[in-house]
Amino acid sequence: MTYQNSSKPPFRADHVGSLLRPTLLHEAREKFALGDMTSNDLRQIEDKCISEVIKKQEAAGMKAITDGEFRRASWHYDFLCSLEGIEQTAPPQGPAFKMGHQINSLSISSKITNPGGVMLDHFRFLKETTKATPKFCIPAPSLAYHRGGRDLIDGTVYPDIEEFWFDLCAAYQDEIAYLSDAGCDYLQLDDTTFAMLCDPKIRDQMTERGDDPNQLIKTYAKGIANAVSAKPTDMTVTVHMCRGNFKSSWIAEGGYEAVAENMFSNLSVDGFFMEWDTDRAGGFEPLRYAPRDKIIVLGLVSTKLPHLETKDDLKRRIDDAAKYIPLENLCLSPQCGFASMAVGNNLSEDDQWRKLALVAETSEEVWG
């Protein structure tokens, strides 16, 4: 394929989405939580901080601009729990971050519906505020199932699991239609499940609860396909996958070999954001399964550590990846967001901007 850098995303220099929240926003949220600030005042501060972070992304050389997810506490709970029928619940025994933090699950206690564009106002402000390409990120539908499985889906509400998937994907179709009507043509679905299923321990946990890990890949891919089935042809949809990202910690370990052939053959999107910042992600060999009409965005720059990678190392790793898929099919980005949760990772805002500038500069030198 011929891939042009200038106009259509994903871009040669791209990024995942979430950014470190500034002190002003953290303080405002604390005041709001204590009842010392109104929702209108909080909104004004969010608007101010988002406007500033948009300018900084543009100055760093990014062509895809996000709102940093500054209105969210979490990359996934805020969206999913805004859908009718889905709520957070105590974590079951299962995957945890390496520093010990246990993650909440999601339970389904009533029919899933979309109450009417749950993040539409987020996108509208983003689009109004940037002259570049607004990129919007929402969690993939698989997150509503993966952590709790069938046990956390009320059997009286959904006696047939296919009805659950149908309603869930219909809610996504509604949201994507709202976003498209508002002018969104670059949508990213954040999905940790594919990379989690690279880890033998997590695969064992899925098997123990009654799920077939290989079938889950197909089920999750089908869910994404159904969710985006009505998208307009000019909307680019990518999937970002990672092994966990909270306070610079992670959950899963293991290369993509365990999922690559199954995933690439079943997941029909325009591009894949895949992390390869450490040995936890294995080598680039699984890229031999990647379709030649898709774009692979190499997540080579760590958002977990302040250490700044070098251009030479990034170029060498891009060359290594190009042994398995043409260079024209590759782009560059950080491996994940800098703040998947509002608390953020253990690096500074200056570190963050240096890393994004490095992505832009390296990309320009590699692809022009």
For each predicted feature, which ranges?
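Domain-level signal for soluble alpha/beta catalytic cores
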Residues: 1-368
